[in-house]
Amino acid sequence: MNKKPKKQRLDDLLVEQGAFPDRDAALRAVMAREVRVDDVYVASAAQLVRPDADIFLKGRKQFVSRGGRKLQGALDAFSQDVAGMNCLDIGSSTGGFTDCLLQAGAARVAALDVNYGQLAWKIRQDARVNVFERTNIKEADPALLGAPFDLIVIDVSFIGLASLAPLFPHFSRPGTVFIGLVKPQFESAHDETDRGVVRDEAVRRRTVEEVGAALADAGFGVTGTIESPITGPEGNVEYLVRAVFRK
């Protein structure tokens, strides 16, 4: 049996999930009765809540992790309709991307991750989600996952998207849309980072171009790139790239 996730202060959790830039902003929202947890208004920003609790912010969507905001930014920027789509989420982790897809109307999401027990209960229990834990995309059976997919999204760490690009056609059909989070810190050389952060914009741009080239070699045509609406760990600037499978 998995242990229940440790409770956190609400204001810390809201900042961690990318809902607010700092604790002061989160506090103001709580005091203004703009935050509900499990459908109940919270009176104190210091209240302890579960990381997988249903948190609602007045006037905007909320996701189980800050990754959802990144993908939502891409869907908005690329005018990407997800309604009715069969989707693959590579590196699902807590489920931020999957949550975003479900809220956007996806018919089904195959949530794949090499780890176990990270997916939020809200996502895990959704009938539209098929969970594939302890599963590496390099070894996954496309048919078992439900390929071909209409949309593939990916958010992984400690490995570059460029190195994974040759795998994506196995899960695609002509017209499959790909949206990937490019993390320059995992695409660049070690000596191009400063304590894990890529500070040189030229290096960051180069990594995006290299991912685009790898996707092109795999049969995808890149249609757009944006800077992520929120930064990654330690302030890393990240990017989202959209491509369409042509072959």
Per-segment meaning from a language model:
Residues M1-A53:
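A basic, amphipathic helix-loop patch mediating RNA/tRNA/ribosome contacts
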Residues D76-A83, L145-G146:
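Glycine-rich helix-loop-beta junction characteristic of Rossmann-like nucleotide cofactor-binding loops
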Residues V82-S93:
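Conserved class I S-adenosyl-L-methionine
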Residues T94-G105:
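Conserved SAM-binding loop of SAM-dependent methyltransferases across substrates and taxa
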Residues A110-S163:
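S-adenosyl-L-methionine
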Residues A162-I179:
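A short glycine-rich, Lys/Arg-flanked "PGG" loop and its adjoining helix->strand segment in the class I
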Residues P184-D200:
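Short, glycine-/aromatic-enriched active-site segment of Class I SAM-dependent methyltransferases
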Residues I230-K247:
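Core SAM-dependent methyltransferase catalytic element
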